[in-house]
Regions:
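Short, structured motif recognition centered on aromatic/hydrophobic residues
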Residues: 1-3, 7, 33, 81-85, ...
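Extended macromolecule-engaging scaffold surfaces
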Residues: 1-18, 40, 49-50
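Extended intrinsically disordered, low-complexity coil regions enriched in Ser, Thr, Gly, Ala
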Residues: 9-26, 88-108
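Short, charged/polar, Gly/Pro-enriched secondary-structure boundary elements
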Residues: 10, 39-42, 116-120
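Short, basic amphipathic alpha-helical segments that act as recognition/interaction helices
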Residues: 24-39, 107-116
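Helix-adjacent hinge/juxtasegments
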Residues: 32-69
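Beta-rich strand-turn-strand
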Residues: 73-96
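Short, Lys/Arg-rich amphipathic alpha-helical interaction segments
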Residues: 114-138
Length: 138
C-alpha cells in the first residue's frame, strides 16, 4: 500500500528514519502506527496508567505493555510512501488489498475498508463507504 502524503509529511517532520512501528489498536479492530518518538510518549502514558491501576487492575498494565511494545513490527517506506504491511498485522486487522489510513494526532490507524464501514462510529463508516463506493465506480 502507499502511505498518504499527510502521513509521509508528518513522519518526515518527526524523524529522520524512514519507518514506523505498527501494532494492534487498544480497543478497535485496526492497526495503530507511530514513530519511535511517539513510542516514548506511549511508555510514559503506560507508566502513568500502571500507577493509577495497580491496586484495582494489576494485570491491565502487563497486557497494555505487551500490546504496545511486544506485539509490534517495524515497517519501512520509500520515497513514494510504499509499504508492505507484515502478514501478521494484515491478518490481525483483516486488511485485504486496500486499506484506510486515519490520522489520530500522534499516531495513525490502518483499517480494513470493510471493517471500518461496519464500525459503529458514523464518521469512520462514512469515510470507508466513500472509498469502497469509489473503488466500485472505477
Amino acid at each position: 500500500m502507499i502511505l498518504p502524503p499527510f502521513v509521509r509529511a508528518t513522519l518526515g517532520r518527526r524523524t529522520e528514519v524512514r519507518g514506523f512501528l505498527v501494532g494492534g489498536h487498544e480497543c478497535d479492530p485496526c492497526l495503530v502506527a507511530y514513530d519511535r518518538g511517539y513510542a516514548r510518549i506511549l511508555h510514559q502514558d503506560s507508566e502513568r496508567r500502571r500507577i493509577a491501576e495497580e491496586a484495582t487492575l494489576p494485570e491491565a498494565s502487563a497486557k497494555r505493555l505487551r500490546r504496545i511494545f511486544g506485539f509490534v513490527e517495524e515497517v519501512g517506506f520509500g520515497d513514494d510512501g510504499a509499504i508492505v504491511l507484515p502478514p501478521m498485522m494484515r491478518r490481525r486487522a483483516r486488511i485485504g488489498a486496500r486499506a484506510l489510513v486515519i490520522g489520530t494526532g500522534g499516531a495513525f490507524e490502518i483499517w480494513s475498508l470493510e471493517v471500518a464501514r461496519d464500525h459503529p462510529d458514523p464518521a469512520l463508516a462514512e469515510i470507508a463507504s466513500f472509498y469502497l463506493d469509489e473503488q466500485h465506480a472505477a
